[in-house]
Amino acid sequence: MSIGKLLSNGALLVDVLIIGAGPAGLSTATGLARQLHTAVVFDSGVYRNAKTQHMHNVLGWDHRNPAELRAAGRADLTTRYSTIQFQNSTIEAIRQVETNQLFEARDNEGHSWYGRKVVLATGVRDIPLDIEGYSECWANGIYHCLFCDGYEERGQETVGVLALGPIANPARALHLARMALRLSESVTIYTNGNEQLAKEIQQAAEESPVGASGLKFEARPIRRFEKGDVAKTVIVHLGESESKTEGFLVYNPQTEVNGPFAKQLALNMTEGGDILTTPPFYETSVPGVFAVGDCATPLKAVTPAVSMGSLAAGGLVAQLQAQALPEFRLDQEL
């Protein structure tokens, strides 16, 4: 089975260009392969969970390295199916060729690739806190998701929640704190110098049906984080000289969609900075462009990414099989 149509300029035309080879992109490719549709999956080698040794809450893959899942998915696609090609390169630009309703993607080596549809599975970049030591502790003591991490450190005496950035409001801070309380005897909520926010969170906790039992509130500025010597502990240095050791910290950071493609294609975005899509097939505001995985949902985890990719494949298949292949003309440049 051919992996695409070779054009007169030497470029490859496939049904779908998939930008990203994480769980979402691989899942999309699998669905397309099952209907003998052609696709190129572009793998930049950049993954949000690259620092993570184990993934969790993934059926059948619990406590396995996420690299194993990616490798297995890629192996399935290359050994069992013949219509999917992988390209280890970074796409730098995408545009729609208006004259023929195709899409052109250009990689970091100057090669052009053409597809009838595009799937953005680029993932996101976590925006770090501007506090010394944060990056060293990220994913190794500071966790963004307590379904993904934390269970292995259960039974702590104390853990911390950082009510900063997107978590700097009572509802989100208390949600994470209550999840953390399942794994620890007490939870300290840090507001990094914001005394008013600390009061608001405390008041909301005390007035809630479950109360504030087990919760502590720390409004002093955080000077720096330091990785502890034991397990996933993090030392939080406060004010001038005091410090507190936590079993681990919880913080869900602001994220930024990887790549320039949302801007290049003029896609609509959500208030949270994700690509806006329409379920159940996750097509964006530009017809023919789909977005799946972390770049298109606030629920940034492996299982939702796989689900989104599978559903997007269903939408892609329906469109591809209902639309005639447009005539191809090379009359525009990026």
Curated annotation (Swiss-Prot):
A GO MF annotation of the entry reads: flavin adenine dinucleotide binding
Give the cofactor binding note. Answer: Binds 1 FAD per subunit.
Name the Pfam families on file: Pyr_redox_2 (PF07992)
Q: Where does FAD bind?
A: 21-24, 43-48, 56, 91, 121, 294, 301-302
Q: Which GO biological-process labels does this protein carry?
A: cell redox homeostasis; cellular response to mycotoxin; gliotoxin biosynthetic process; mycotoxin biosynthetic process
Keyword Glycoprotein tagged: no
Protein's UniProt keywords contain ATP-binding: no
Cofactors that this protein relies on: FAD
Coiled-coil residues are none
Cysteine disulfide partners in this protein:
145-148
Q: What happens when the gene is disrupted?
A: Impairs gliotoxin oxidation, leading to unchecked methylation and subsequent significant S-adenosylmethionine (SAM) depletion and S-adenosylhomocysteine (SAH) overproduction which in turn significantly contributes to hypersensitivity to gliotoxin of gliT-deficient A.fumigatus. Results in altered expression of over 200 genes involved in many functions.
List UniProt keywords, sorted A-Z: Disulfide bond, FAD, Flavoprotein, NADP, Oxidoreductase, Redox-active center, Virulence
Tell me the subunit arrangement. Homodimer.
Q: Which family does it belong to?
A: Belongs to the class-II pyridine nucleotide-disulfide oxidoreductase family.
Q: What is this protein called?
A: Thioredoxin reductase gliT
Q: Which gene encodes it?
A: gliT
